[in-house]
Amino acid sequence: MEYEVPASSVEAYQETGFAVLPAVIDDRTLGMLREECAYFVGYTDAGMDAQGVEVMGITHRGKRYFISNRYRSSARLADFLFGALMAEITTSFLGESVFLFNEQWVVKGADQGMKFAWHQDSGYVKAFDPATTHPPYLTCWCALDDMTESNGTISVLPHDVLGTRNHIFDHEREQGSNDLIGYAGAESGEVITMGAGSVAVFSSTSLHRSGPNTTDQQRRVYLAQYSSSPLMSSTGELWAQAVPFITQGEVVYSKQDDLDDSAVSPRIRKTIRAKPKQHG
């Protein structure tokens, strides 16, 4: 039986700005995501080696990784991002029009995984485009490990606590970490504890943070973000990407068209791009 998002989860999202979908990613897919995560962390470490640096943006070697928009360098990730599970989740919360806006690995290293301050995902858009008026988009926070306070899970503030439903706070950059901070008050939020294979969904205007990882294992998340329409800057330019996924409730994504491009990483197996042979 295919998964269906419970009506209670949609209601919770509409009321508070977030919801948890327990154990929705099957074991085989979970294993694939963990393998891909290991590849991209290694790739990022190699990139820092080549540049002779320990920090790239908000990525800190061994402590915290944010690795964005690399799915076209994988033969397998598109099957998850544009598959039946994500189609069900995204249409339940966004409606009949869905675009992939952003995807990234978020990994906290063992023992030394850094915290991440209170912020709104939309705050990172506003930081570069103060005049932005984009509607909230959907973050799907996919747990590749059991998420606990000890390994640095997220805490989320319900919309009504600080009035974040359709409001993007100004964010300030923190020296050293390069984090953008949107709130520094006393509210503690709701701690999201959930098992591997679960997905936390929240609005891009929801304030959230994560603690440090004090365990002896990595804490791994695959984060996929979707919008109901392309996100455009205040000057009319496209933000990140807008890969068509769902139109009028139907899947329109074509992996063949998306990955059959000379710019796609050679890591993609040739069979993904192979066209039918002509006989005659």
Predicted regions and their residues:
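Non-heme Fe(II)-dependent double-stranded beta-helix
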Residues: 1-16, 22-118, 123-124, 129, ...
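Double-stranded beta-helix
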Residues: 11, 147-207
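Non-heme Fe(II)/2-oxoglutarate
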Residues: 43, 48-55, 199, 206-280
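Short, structured patches in soluble enzyme cores that scaffold and shape functional sites
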Residues: 104, 120-122, 142-146, 158
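Short edge-strand/loop segments of extracellular domains
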Residues: 108, 157-164, 225-231
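A short secondary-structure junction signal
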Residues: 114-120, 127-130, 150-159, 165-169, ...
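Short, conserved beta-strand element in jelly-roll/cupin
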Residues: 126-149, 193, 225-228
